[in-house]
Amino acid sequence: LTNPNKLANTFTSNGMGNISDKTISSYIDYLMDSFLISRAERYDVKGKKYISSPYKYYFTDIGLRNARLNFRQQEETHIMENIIYNELLIRGFNVDVGIVEHVQTDSDGKRRQKKYEIDFVCNRGNQRYYIQSAFSMPDQEKAEQEQRSLIYTNDFFKKIIVVKDNIVPWHNELGILIIGLKDFLLKNNSLEL
């Protein structure tokens, strides 16, 4: 998530100059206007409203991003998430980042409200999908972490976890579709499996 004010503070604290948050916002707008990046807004799933800031930005062309960085910083998890985002846009979805609040009781017996992120809330007409990008789910703990925000939506829209592994698509005991990235990208009906 990107917050121009935090970026400005980072530039200042790292001795990289005094750049205002308004300047950073302008540059982000220039990048969006030139179609180099696009913005996903934050959406409160239970409250059914948009949260004004911070936004999440994705590169429209991963190759240009990689070339600009001289093919360094190859964070596969972020690149995979970016590819999924771009594919959803190509398929005609409006794509937001979902926020789900859930009250939990901690070890002290106190109830605390926690926020969980859903990577993508995808809407097209009357269709809605919740999608998590999970580079891998090597164990039950990671699987529970990835599906937690999906479960806390407490609704009946389709829930999907996309993993990098080349797997046969399957539904877990909670009805969540687990699908490999390759099948997700190559099968036009991959969201309907």
Language-model segments: which ranges?
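Loop/helix-junction capping segments adjacent to catalytic residues or to phosphate/diphosphate-binding pockets
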Residues: 1, 18, 140-141
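A short, structure-level motif marking secondary-structure boundaries and short turns
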Residues: 11-14, 68-70
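Short, positively charged loop/turn segments that connect secondary-structure elements
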Residues: 12-23
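A cross-kingdom feature that marks ATP-driven nucleic-acid transaction machinery
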Residues: 22-193
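Short acidic, hydrophobic short linear motifs in intrinsically disordered regions
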Residues: 1-11
